Amino acid sequence: MSSTGVLKGAVAVVTGGASGMGLATVRRFVAEGASVVVADLNVEAGERVAAELEHAVRFERCDVSVEADVAAAVRAAVDSFGQLNIMFNNAGMGGAFGPITEIESDDWDTTFAVLVRGVFNGTKHAARQMIEQGAGGSIINTASVAGLGGGGGPQAYSAAKAAVINLTETTANELAAHSIRVNAICPGIIFTPLMHRGDEADAETVMSELQPLPKRGEGSDIAGAALWLAGPDAAFVTGTSIVVDGGISSAGTRLYGRLGGTQNLDRVVGIAHGTTGQAASVRRL
């Protein structure tokens, strides 16, 4: 893919940037001229990314549910590269999974701590820095098609992603006066390391059966959306959620009918989150 240098001179923090959609976005941002702080729990993977991309990337160990860690990642961007222009709140987890009667309260709370508080922490500290700089900026949050409406998805994950969409809209309204744009990306079934924990062949079958578009969702598809939201072509875009799902959400109720009911829907969700055949348990990306 050719580069246009659309992010030349920009500085970004990407949480969950050591794998999956985050890593694809880090590589795309760097290819377009940005410097990036990769904020991730996985030290080995994060250091590997920093070594691969050398001077353009700094790794910072970060648990997004811990505010001090996120604040440190923002400081790392300023200390290493002089500013912060883009914040991609992408770190996530499959979350508490299983029947509502079986989910443990602690697992529910952990899911929200990572998926919602993590976005809050990132938005808060990125906005503080961007306001201080006085030059605007772009904050991008990873939500999900599961957060767009009720359905048969995992309760904790779906509810948390709905909260991310709402948080995106409210903070976009608040921060617009500072020329800070806040948007969300709603992926569908994206083939990431999390999915590798499930049945890869089954995942391929599920995606080909359910998506109107006959292609596998890849991290690069999310990276493309993030690049657009981060760059000047989206200068008039804020408070919106971009759906990148191969058409799954447009299938509406037809999707549920094609799945054949709750049992198969649970199977699909299990594949997508690498939790097939397991009890309600928290699994981090």
Regions inferred by a protein language model and the residue ranges of each:
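Canonical Rossmann dinucleotide-binding motif of NAD(H)/NADP(H)-dependent dehydrogenases/reductases
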Residues: T4-V37
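The beta1-alpha1 cofactor-binding region of Rossmann-like NAD(H)/NADP(H)-dependent oxidoreductases
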Residues: V43-E44, C62-A72, S105, S220
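Substrate-binding pocket helix/loop in short-chain dehydrogenase/reductase
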Residues: G98-I100, E104-F112, M207
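Active-site helix of classical SDR
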Residues: T123, A160, T168
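Alpha-helical segment proximal to the catalytic Tyr-Lys
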Residues: R128, N173-A177, A235
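Residue(s) in the substrate-gating loop at a strand-loop-helix junction
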Residues: S144
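C-terminal helical subdomain
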Residues: A184, D202-V237, I242-G246, H273-L285
